Swiss-Prot record:
Gene that encodes the chain: EXPA7
Family per similarity comment: Belongs to the expansin family. Expansin A subfamily.
Name this polypeptide is given: Expansin-A7
One GO cellular component term noted in the UniProt record for this chain: membrane
Any GO BP annotation: plant-type cell wall loosening
Length: 262
């Protein structure tokens, strides 16, 4: 009887700890680990200022304001994965090219789509045509790996954990009956599979994937403080960001949480 009682007490204690962390918005099931090395090619777009890399198909807007800066890349269709690749982080190193800077690597965040160009052969200009895996990097990121005049370089790459400062950020768009959320600064695997929103007077409401890193809910939520449930696309882990936005939230504003993946 003694061992059974001890086991029950431990499970009860663990359940209480789980609930406390989930309510605080700080619970994380584990750490995302680096993936295997693979091979691809990389090019660059824009100039040294990164002006042409702002915005993009993930919806992050001004990449300096959203925290990504110039360490970014547009992904080929295969890697972009209908927007579920947004926010993922990749370690990239130049491989087997005379233009490589020896021993150099850099980490970039996926912020854009490199669309296919079916007017050009996949091996002669149509670098982002499926099923190719390709990175069209911001020029400053590319220049960490190789001389820019190389144009295109063979690379080795792998998924790595996204190291983020602070919690996830939720940019609000929409109106009183349609809520559109862009999620930024996501740690861990960096990506999102699904989301739900909870008003202070509602149960959890599932949100649908709109485009890029945005999710939407068709519901009247104005006048309620809002919390979010976020599930990672890669790991399936779920965390809760409680009371992210106050009852007087408005579109065009970005609200910060304390919750994040690792």
């Amino acid at each position: 009887m003694g061992p059974i009682s001890s086991s029950w007490s431990f499970n009860k204690f663990f359940s209480i700890v789980f609930v406390v962390f989930a309510i605080s918005g700080e619970f994380v099931a584990g750490y995302y680990r680096p993936g295997p090395w693979r091979y691809a090619h990389a090019t660059f777009y824009g100039d040294e200022t990164g002006g042409e890399t702002m915005g993009g198909a993930c919806g992050y807007g001004n990449l300096f304001n959203s925290g990504y800066g110039l360490s970014t890349a547009a992904l080929s269709t295969t890697l972009f994965n209908d927007g579920y690749g947004c926010g993922q982080c990749f370690q990239i190193t130049c491989s087997k090219s005379p233009h490589c800077y020896s021993g150099k690597s850099t980490v970039v965040t996926a912020t854009n789509l490199c669309p296919p160009n079916w007017y050009q052969d996949s091996n002669a200009g149509g670098w982002c045509n499926p099923p190719r895996t390709h990175f069209d990097m911001a020029k400053p990121a590319f220049m960490k790996l190789a001389y820019w005049r190389a144009g295109i370089i063979p690379v080795a790459y792998r998924r790595v954990p996204c190291q983020r400062s602070g919690g996830m950020r939720f940019q609000f768009q929409g109106n009183s009956y349609w809520l559109l959320i862009f999620v930024m600064n996501v740690g861990g695997a960096g990506d999102i599979k699904s989301m739900a929103v909870k008003g202070s007077r509602t149960n959890w409401i599932s949100m649908s994937h709109n485009w890029g890193a945005s999710y939407q809910a068709f519901s009247s939520l104005y006048g309620q403080s809002l919390s979010f449930r976020v599930t990672s696309y890669t790991t399936g882990e779920t965390i809760y960001a409680w009371n992210v936005a106050p009852a007087n939230w408005s579109g065009g504003k970005t609200y910060k949480s304390t919750a994040n993946f690792r």
